[in-house]
Amino acid sequence: MNYQPTPEDRFTFGLWTVGWQGRDPFGDATRPALDPVEAVQRLAELGAYGVTFHDDDLIPFGSSDAEREAHVKRFRQALDATGMTVPMATTNLFTHPVFKDGAFTANDRDVRRYALRKTIRNIDLAVELGAKVYVAWGGREGAESGAAKDVRAALDRMKEAFDLLGEYVTSQGYDIRFAIEPKPNEPRGDILLPTIGHALAFIERLERPELYGVNPEVGHEQMAGLNFPHGIAQALWAGKLFHIDLNGQSGIKYDQDLRFGAGDLRAAFWLVDLLESAGWEGPRHFDFKPPRTEDIDGVWASAAGCMRNYLILKERAAAFRADPEVQEALRAARLDQLAEPTAADGLQALLADRTAYEDFDVDAAAARGMAFERLDQLAMDHLLGARG
């Protein structure tokens, strides 16, 4: 297989990823700022399909209207020259100190109103640039102490904010949907909507739930000790996977944002297998940080590695599914039975079926082996390149 990415692979990157300067809580930047236009050009050369942005990635915070217009014009020219797209955009509601207690759920009402206006302004730009998805990450929505936040009231304010944004895009006739990005543990001590499950439950309480889905990130679910492919499967099952952030993570620790494929390689394999077998048509969006050890050449090597690793895993997953021995092992593990309804004949037939209870041989059923180890080893063989 050719591991050279093309726009048909639909790989996208946030401007904040390749543009990260390496500044962290313990050290200053190790790289100079990256011009968004250069980011567009270099990513296009690598074979990417598009770029995404926070408002402040593209337009420095506090810019005048004239400065804003100039930044957008340069960016649009770069998009036109390279053929790159903007499938998604989002708002930075976490960097400026005004958001120290949150944005949509800040205790200060005037901060909440400012956060909504800031978001609405960038939604207009996102639609202008062709984005179909608007991501919302509530990184500062939470607390460090119990009395500091009335969580029920905060969820009311969160619902109010999303309902207002839904009203706005509907009134404007915008063809755009929202994707809530869950994350636990940082930067707030306890963050609202920390996992996929929290976000899915919240969405069902909104006035226009059809406008809202999730934007799960590999590292975020793993920070909570959860199985990311399982979370994605549930989001797909619910029809709520509107966007996805790909990166790498090594277990339950801080948000590492490694390049995709680094960290938990088995989880990355099963994730790619799931996305490809499910026919996921959205972008494969990389939200990672090139390590602060790298110079600018290392930034592009890291970005290229994200795409290459996805394509390698895509090839390995396809070989796994096409392997006749794997197909036989799947049947031995009775995956075909799992796809069958348990009681398609209805409740009354189930209650009348003596083989379902009275005559069911529980000891014989308990003695059946599931053959999962053989199946898993076949997957390992394909992942490690020993088969196919």
Curated annotation (Swiss-Prot):
List, alphabetically, the InterPro entries matched. Answer: Xyl_isomerase-like_sf, Xyl_isomerase-like_TIM-brl, XylA_actinobac, Xylose_isomerase
Q: Which GO terms describe its cellular component?
A: cytoplasm
| Swiss-Prot/TrEMBL cofactor(s) | Mg(2+)
- The UniProt annotation places Mg(2+) 2 binding at 217, 220, 255, 257
Provide the active-site residues from the annotation. 54, 57
The record's annotation in PROSITE patterns points to: XYLOSE_ISOMERASE
Q: Which Gene3D superfamilies match?
A: Divalent-metal-dependent TIM barrel enzymes
Query: Which Pfam family is one of those matched by this entry?
Result: AP_endonuc_2
Compartments (UniProt record): Cytoplasm
Q: Name one GO biological process term.
A: D-xylose metabolic process
A GO molecular function held by the record? magnesium ion binding
Q: Which free-text remark accompanies the cofactor?
A: Binds 2 magnesium ions per subunit.
EC number(s) reported in the record: 5.3.1.5
Residues where Mg(2+) 1 binds? 181, 217, 245, 287
Question: Which controlled-vocabulary keywords does the entry list?
Answer: Carbohydrate metabolism, Cytoplasm, Isomerase, Magnesium, Metal-binding, Xylose metabolism
Q: Could you tell me which NCBIfam families the record lists for this protein?
A: xylA_Arthro (TIGR02631)
Subunit composition and interactions: Homotetramer.
Family listed? Belongs to the xylose isomerase family.
Can you say what this protein is called?
Xylose isomerase
Organism of this sequence: Streptomyces thermocyaneoviolaceus
Q: What is the lineage of its organism?
A: Bacteria, Bacillati, Actinomycetota, Actinomycetes, Kitasatosporales
* Gene encoding the protein: xylA
